[in-house]
């Protein structure tokens, strides 16, 4: 049985004061880590403080991206060594906004995935199709290609620890979401790709999230599906009450 993982991606929202207030409100109310992984992926500036404020609790802290190098002349970047030193647990890699706005490629995402494992971070690896690709019937091919390239060079044991987030690009922040059945079909296809590349055991162990306009009102429909093990949530993770409803839904799946 795969443990659900509900991760809030705050993107570029909140001040430090607001972030700390949020964490203080929810950290004692999230489900036990043994039942659900409850994660907040916050802006870099807040990570140190939030990790300190959540030590000893069941709320875990993640980053939204990172560089693949440990150090070097990469102005403005943050390395996996820095994140690990802060006590960060998870890192989102290859989000469509990073791919579209900051020229991330499948190759750079793969370098980051390998670096995350080298430094003991758990990658949340994003994949998903555009509306044009979906309408052209290319969803499975696009997602399979992204997953295969992102996981290249990993061992089956590493793949078991990874998280994949299927986020159809047309559903991110639009209020539109895939149907639970359609999302499950794509997540099942992702699992079959992992099985082909790394074996049935790795495919059975890897956790696959759905993302794209997930909110308290629809999360249970997604979590009830066979191949969906959690959610990567944007806007609905910004308010404490909403986030708590999301992670509580994970507890009952």
UniProtKB/Swiss-Prot annotation:
Similarity comment: family membership: Belongs to the triosephosphate isomerase family.
Biological or metabolic pathway of the protein: Carbohydrate biosynthesis; gluconeogenesis; Carbohydrate degradation; glycolysis; D-glyceraldehyde 3-phosphate from glycerone phosphate: step 1/1
Annotated localization: Cytoplasm
Subunit and interaction comment: Homodimer.
Coarse class of the protein's main subcellular location: cytoplasm
The protein's Enzyme Commission number: 5.3.1.1
One Pfam entry name: TIM
Keyword Hydrolase belongs to the record: no
Superkingdom field: Bacteria
Organism annotation: Geobacillus thermodenitrificans (strain NG80-2)
Active site per UniProt: 95 (electrophile), 167 (proton acceptor)
Matching PROSITE patterns: TIM_1, TIM_2
Gene Ontology cellular-component terms listed: cytosol
Protein name in the entry: Triosephosphate isomerase
Reactions that this protein is recorded to catalyse: D-glyceraldehyde 3-phosphate = dihydroxyacetone phosphate
Gene Ontology process terms (BP): gluconeogenesis; glyceraldehyde-3-phosphate biosynthetic process; glycerol catabolic process; glycolytic process
Molecular functions per Gene Ontology: triose-phosphate isomerase activity
Keywords: Cytoplasm, Gluconeogenesis, Glycolysis, Isomerase, Phosphoprotein
Modified positions (Phosphoserine) in chain numbering: 213
Binding site for substrate: 9-11, 173, 213, 234-235
